């Protein structure tokens, strides 16, 4: 895996004895790879908007509040035949990637969705409420600490790798 200014390149190699051969390569444009997992012939790539590329990680203004429009991505590939690796699912959640854990077949991903200022307008609610897969999270999945001076959310998601169709659960 190589990260550079505009993209991340993922390379899959075959190793037999002293011979190493590149069998597959693909690029994630405007992404920065944060973490990789390999489990049961599935490659999980966790990435975020490229730090050097501001076209995706810009500041949006919603009245008197500014949100950092950063996104964490979870891309799942079938690598059972490495030379024919193919993406089987791509998921996303608001915020910059912070950490993840893989346990008992589930991937848990944590990101930080930051808001600066006070958000009082409902006109731009999608700008400051966390989202998963491009959809604003439901109210019953969000808890806000009232006295939090930072105005931020920790966005938490879980994916069952046996059925990676969608998130198993979400919360903020």
Annotate each predicted stretch with a short phrase.
Residues 1-172:
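Beta-sheet-rich non-transmembrane sensory/scaffold domains
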């Amino acid at each position: 895996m190589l990260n550079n200014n505009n993209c991340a390149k993922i390379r899959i190699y075959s190793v037999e004895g002293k011979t190493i051969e590149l069998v597959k390569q693909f690029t994630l444009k405007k992404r920065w790879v944060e973490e990789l997992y390999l489990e049961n012939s599935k490659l999980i790539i966790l990435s975020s908007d490229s730090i050097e590329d501001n076209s995706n990680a810009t500041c949006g203004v919603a009245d008197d509040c500014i949100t950092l429009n950063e996104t964490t991505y979870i891309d799942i590939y079938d690598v059972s035949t490495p030379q024919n690796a193919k993406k089987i699912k791509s998921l996303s959640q608001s915020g910059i990637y912070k950490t993840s854990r893989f346990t008992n077949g589930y991937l848990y991903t944590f990101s930080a969705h930051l808001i600066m200022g006070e958000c009082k307008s409902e006109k731009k609610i999608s700008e400051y409420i966390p989202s998963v897969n491009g959809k604003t999270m439901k109210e019953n999945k969000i808890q806000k600490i009232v006295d939090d001076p930072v105005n931020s959310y920790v966005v938490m998601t879980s994916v069952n790798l046996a059925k990676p169709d969608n998130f198993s659960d979400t919360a903020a």
